[in-house]
Curated annotation (Swiss-Prot):
Biased composition (Basic and acidic residues): 83-110
One Pfam assignment: Ribosomal_S16
Gene Ontology terms, MF aspect: structural constituent of ribosome
Protein's name according to its UniProt entry: Small ribosomal subunit protein bS16
Family of this protein: Belongs to the bacterial ribosomal protein bS16 family.
GO CC annotation: cytoplasm; small ribosomal subunit
Ranges where the record places region Disordered: 81-122
Cross-referenced PANTHER family: 30S RIBOSOMAL PROTEIN S16, SMALL RIBOSOMAL SUBUNIT PROTEIN BS16M
Keyword Ribonucleoprotein: yes
Gene name of the encoded protein: rpsP
Any single GO BP term: translation
Source organism (scientific name): Xanthobacter autotrophicus (strain ATCC BAA-1158 / Py2)
Biased composition (Low complexity): 111-122
UniProt KW keywords: Ribonucleoprotein, Ribosomal protein
């Protein structure tokens, strides 16, 4: 049985509220869970103390038992100091694509050709 520490959505339409739960990985997102270890209310301000409420002792115990946190829960656990989350780094994502590089190169060539013509005319 693979255990996950994940979010189970509750609340009304357009008013999300999440429980941080321990659940079998095969169970539905909002379905049966083993234990509730906290809550997350995304509607509160980011600096509000009630935005993420987490029982650190229970979370630590489940991590020691082998439960795997999802990405979002891993952020919460990292903020609480319970586990270290590696920073994601994708430097290629910020680079322009092939076509954009070609267009930029063409613009630079046109600008260079235009400035040499202006200098020759003077």
């Amino acid at each position: 049985m693979s255990l996950k520490i994940r979010l189970a959505r509750g609340g009304a339409k357009k008013r999300p509220y999440y429980r941080i739960v321990i659940a079998d990985a095969r169970s539905p997102r909002d379905g049966r869970f083993i234990e509730k270890i906290g809550t997350f209310n995304p509607l509160l301000a980011k600096d509000a103390e009630n935005r993420v409420v987490l029982d650190a002792d229970k979370a630590k115990a489940w991590l020691e038992k082998g439960a795997q946190p999802t990405d979002r829960v891993a952020r919460f656990l990292d903020a609480a100091g319970l586990m270290k989350r590696d920073a994601k780094n994708n430097p290629k994502k910020g680079e322009p694509g092939e076509k954009a590089k070609e267009r930029a190169k063409e613009r630079a060539e046109k600008a260079a050709a235009g400035s040499t013509e202006d200098a020759a005319a003077e």
